[in-house]
Regions:
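Acidic, glycine-rich active-site loops and adjacent beta-strand->loop/helix elements
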Residues: 9-11, 41-45
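Glycine-centered short loops/turns at secondary-structure junctions
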Residues: 31-32, 74
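Short internal beta-strands
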Residues: 34-40, 77-79
Length: 79
């Protein structure tokens, strides 16, 4: 199965900004699905180093860990 996750949330809502990546790398990817992530609108700022390192939502891993796992597993991230 192939799934493309999308978020438009940025730093103003760190939990919502992290959910798509969390579902992609800790959900679908772990059960063997092909996944990709689209960052649009305010979410594009999440790839900046200082932003990436500071975003921590509630109940999800920090954004830097999610992006590292995505990179480790070659998950495409579209901006």
């Amino acid at each position: 199965m192939r799934t493309l996750y999308m978020t438009t949330a940025g730093t103003s809502d760190p939990t919502r900004a992290s959910i798509s990546l969390h579902l992609a790398v800790n959900g679908s990817l772990e059960v063997g699905h092909d996944v990709g992530v689209v960052l649009a609108g305010d979410a594009t700022e999440l790839l900046k180093t200082r932003v990436r390192d500071s975003v921590e939502g509630v109940g999800v891993p920090p954004l830097r860990e999610l992006l590292a796992k995505a990179r480790q597993h070659n998950v495409p991230i579209y901006v």
